[in-house]
A protein has these predicted regions:
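The feature marks the mature, well-folded catalytic cores of soluble enzymes
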Residues: 1-181
C-alpha cells in the first residue's frame, strides 16, 4: 500500500490524480487513513514540505519504507533552526503557523528539549515582536496575539533575547528579507 503525508503540492488537480492512483493520504483535510494503521509492508511518501519529527518517528517505528522527497531548501532551514536551538537562539519563523512546512520546521526548532520558536506571518507581526524586544510590553497580550504560533513554553521576556530568522520556503523572498531587517 502507498500513502502520502498530506498534499504533495497545493494543487487540487494534482492531489486528485495522486488519489486516483490509489495513494492514500495520512494527514490534512483529505485524510484517508491513520498512522497507527500502517504496517512494515507499507510505503509512505514524505512530500517536499517535509513532516514534523513526531510523525516521522511514528512512521519509522512502524517499520514502513519511507520515500522522503523533502526539498533541499527546506532541509537547509531545518539545519539552521537546529543550530539555533543548540546556541539558545530562538527561531523566528516567517510563515503560516498551520502550514505543513512551518510545523515541520518548528518541530526541529525544539529538538531534545532545547530551543524555542515564534511564527510571524506579516510585517505587522514582525513590528509587534520588534517593539516588544525594544520596549517590553504586556506579556499576556503578546502570548494571546501569537497563540498557536510559538513553542509550548514560550516566554517573550526570556526567549526574545537572542533570535535568528528562518522561513517557510514558499513565502515571498522579499517579505522574508523584510522580516530579517
Amino acid at each position: 500500500r502507498l500513502f502520502i503525508l498530506g498534499e504533495i503540492i497545493h494543487n487540487p488537480e494534482v492531489n486528485e490524480q495522486i488519489g486516483a492512483l490509489g495513494i492514500r493520504n495520512l494527514l490534512g483535510r483529505e485524510k484517508q487513513a491513520e498512522v497507527n494503521e500502517l504496517t512494515a509492508e507499507d510505503v509512505v511518501i514524505v512530500p517536499a514540505f517535509g513532516t514534523d519529527v513526531t510523525t516521522l518517528a511514528e512512521i519509522k517505528a512502524r517499520g514502513c519504507q519511507i520515500v522522503d522527497t523533502t526539498c533541499g531548501d527546506v532541509m537547509s532551514v531545518w539545519k539552521r533552526v537546529r543550530q539555533n536551538a543548540t546556541e539558545d537562539v530562538t527561531s523566528i519563523i516567517h510563515g503560516k503557523a498551520s502550514h505543513e512546512e512551518t510545523r515541520a520546521t518548528a518541530s526541529r526548532a525544539v529538538l531534545e528539549g532545547r530551543g524555542h520558536y515564534l511564527v510571524v506571518l506579516t510585517l505587522a507581526d514582525t513590528d509587534y515582536v520588534c517593539d516588544y524586544i525594544r520596549k517590553g510590553g504586556d506579556r499576556a497580550e503578546f502570548l494571546a496575539h501569537f497563540a498557536g504560533a510559538m513553542s509550548d513554553d514560550f516566554d517573550p521576556d526570556l526567549h526574545l533575547r537572542r533570535v535568528g530568522v528562518a522561513n517557510q520556503t514558499t513565502m515571498m523572498r522579499g517579505e522574508t528579507e523584510e522580516v530579517q531587517r
